[in-house]
Amino acid sequence: MCIRDSAMAAKFSGMDDERGFIMLHVDINQHSPELVGSVFDFIESKETKGVNNSLRKCLSAMKKINERRQIMWQASRWKHYNDFRVFIMGIKGNDEIFGDGVVYEGVSEEPKKYRGQTGAQDNIIPLMDIFSGIINNYPKNELTHYLKDLRSYRPKCIQNFLEDVRLFFTTSNNSILNQIKANKNFRSLEILLELLEEIYLFRNGHWQFVQRYIMQNTLYPKATGGTPIISWIPNQINAVLKTMQELSLIHISEPTRLLSI
């Protein structure tokens, strides 16, 4: 897939910067099948070699995603973000703009409040959060509540899929960490730390986009999904760092037997 050959079926401003911004998100998702496949491979793996290969496959997909993510700087110029950002701003969470909500003529006389388009509604990082165990370190605060609310906008089948994956990996015997400890699999620990680093790089890269595209372009402190810009992504980055710290403290005795697997 080439982003230059992609076009939008529906558009707002019609500018190249809007097309680049939207279609790069589509471009990134071309690697989602490999990501999802690696999770299923892990679930089905019964031996150490299969577990490690599935983690390598997942790591490879995340590296490709991070490589494509960096194209954003060329795909959509930051100074032009506000030219189309206004069209994807949500109602919910932006009470300063919409007050009591918006009445959709011909649909309902009751004002509605919906959140706007946001990367938090994507499935790449949420799946990785569940798979890697980051979800266990989500802070119990209002920002995490926002995250869960945003995810309720997904198609029901995707919500069910992520919930099934969550239920599987939150069972103690199935969690990656517990499998690593039980099997004394040092190589899995090493690959998982690399995977967490890629998730961190993705979120940190997103944070850099937010600072450049939004914070330098407007004084309005809310993201399109209605979340507070300054604290939203750092909240998620901290969950990644806490998970990495937990892994770094794991001591596995006699790991050398598995180093070459």
Task: Give residue ranges: language-model regions.
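Extended, compositionally biased non-globular segments
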Residues: 127-248
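Generic hydrophobic alpha-helical segments
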Residues: 41-42, 135, 206, 259
